[in-house]
């Protein structure tokens, strides 16, 4: 869990909230659906993916594809720092189940799928305004 938190956010104040989202999803029986685990499976952890994930990659069943598997991947996907480990051990008490990039380097968190979809739409607008060319599907992390 800590390695996923490490890869999901570099914003110190978000780590415990990101960890809470993953704990909440597991408690609800939801899949983690987090892009960094898919990227690890695609690259074997050997390189950075300098593009958005393709739908075919999200649909490919690998032990690290948390869109396709239940629970955590079989191994860490990174070497987590102390702050990510602490966040995983003591996540926030939070109602959130979703998050998406907010355009500032951080994330917008949501309790419901409807809230999340609105946040994703805002992120897509930011991407369009910045001229981003991605093939990334709607993120649910």
Outline where the language-model segments fall:
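Bacterial extracytoplasmic/cell-wall-associated proteins, especially those involved in peptidoglycan
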Residues: 1-141
């Amino acid at each position: 869990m800590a390695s996923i938190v490490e890869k999901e956010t570099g914003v110190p104040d978000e780590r415990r909230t990101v960890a809470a989202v993953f704990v909440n999803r597991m408690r609800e029986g939801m899949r983690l659906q987090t892009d960094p685990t898919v990227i690890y499976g695609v690259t074997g952890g050997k390189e950075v993916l300098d593009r958005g994930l393709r739908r075919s990659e999200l649909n490919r069943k690998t032990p690290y594809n948390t869109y396709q598997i239940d629970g955590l991947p079989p191994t860490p996907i990174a070497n987590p720092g102390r702050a990510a480990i602490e966040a995983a051990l003591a996540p926030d008490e939070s109602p959130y189940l979703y998050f998406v990039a907010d355009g500032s380097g951080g994330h917008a968190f949501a309790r419901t799928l409807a809230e999340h979809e609105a946040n994703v739409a805002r992120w897509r607008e930011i991407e369009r305004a910045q001229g981003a060319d991605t093939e990334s599907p709607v993120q649910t992390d």
